[in-house]
Curated annotation (Swiss-Prot):
Entries under PANTHER family matching the protein: UPF0173 METAL-DEPENDENT HYDROLASE MJ1163-RELATED (PTHR43546), UPF0282 PROTEIN MJ1629 (PTHR43546:SF4)
Family: Belongs to the UPF0282 family.
HAMAP family, per the entry: UPF0282
Protein name as annotated: UPF0282 protein Saci_0277
InterPro entries: Metallo-B-lactamas, RibonucZ/Hydroxyglut_hydro, UPF0173_UPF0282_UlaG_hydrolase, UPF0282_hydrls
Amino acid sequence: MEFTPLAFESLGVRSQATLVETKDVRILIDPAVSLAPRRFGLPPHQIEVDRLTELAKKIYEEAKIADIIIITHYHYDHHDPGYVIPLDIYQNKTVYIKDPQNFINPSQKFRRAPRFIKTITGKPKTMESADGKVVKYGSTTIQFSKAVPHGADERLGYVIQVAINDKDSTILFTSDIEGAPKNSHIDFIKSVRPNFLIIDGPLSYLLGRALSQDELDTEIKNMEEVVRNGLQYAIIDHHVLRDPNYESVLKPVKEVANSVGCKVISASEYLREPPQLLEAKRRELFQRDNRPAKIPRGLAKLLSAGEGG
């Protein structure tokens, strides 16, 4: 089994788009990209816009030849109703989605999920809610968790975690659990016992606003527990890499991981590419070049639709 991070914060955008390939199927998880509409009081920089365009094209090309597309929830950095990535990626695909009716917050239940489903209806070969299901394709098993909260606060909604096993190894994609603050987050990880983990990390860039110090401490403690669970690799990338101080936030987790032989890295490190922490460095980007960005129409619609994730 091979997996490729396609778009993450360390690659320059808001996303967790991931390609997983086994000898049986090509699986694309959360084919979407976004940017922070405002960060440090500033709009997206042109470099961020250009990078988003580049990675959106990459996701599009990989999506066209995927067999399965999975949508773990309805935030715009995890699903795209056609704003940036063309909807023909869903043509003749098998699509698994987060249940749009149950364990879902109002903004996703009544607006985002219905809009997305309406826009792709008629394109997929099949489309079904995935929460709690297990499906098999040859020697490949895809296991979906029951809906778990998007972090500590259910008001942000719920997500599904995805475990893929090809009999040789298991990769687990946590989606947006914000560093696993709840038992329901880590219980699924423990039950699956993956070799490889892709996890988003805490919302430390919102410490003191949407995250308390006690909550952050709990999330770090739980992530330490997770890396003790027999992992070989943990890619920690997404929410936490929006924080300019992410290295100090993750230092305790990395120390525990090193002690048990687990390698903790970002998506860019996994790909052996230099990090492009563009959102975290937005102030510096504007200090070097403060010209307004040229925002494509689709991206402008996405940014005006709200952050969500």
